[in-house]
């Protein structure tokens, strides 16, 4: 199979914006890089059930990418918020 396109080509807020907004509404704070990585990788945790994360655009959008690579990408973008 062909290689995955670089994460640099991905639009952070396009993939995570709705999740970040819903997470902030529910918890009162922004999600961290680990939580965003789980969302983008399609890894369910109990909070995601409450947030109905599977129905949020972007859920599992980066599931084919290595976890550590997605976490670094998410952390870099969180630092810019």
Model-derived segments and spans:
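Accessory DNA-binding and partner-docking regions appended to nucleic-acid-acting proteins
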Residues: 1-81
């Amino acid at each position: 199979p062909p290689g995955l396109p670089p994460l640099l080509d991905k639009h952070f807020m396009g993939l995570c914006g709705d999740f970040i907004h819903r997470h902030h509404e529910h918890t009162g704070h922004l999600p961290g890089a680990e939580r965003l990585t789980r969302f983008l990788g399609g890894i369910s945790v109990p909070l995601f059930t409450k947030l109905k994360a599977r129905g949020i655009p972007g859920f599992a959008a980066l599931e084919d990418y290595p976890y550590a690579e997605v976490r670094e990408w998410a952390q870099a973008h969180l630092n810019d918020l």
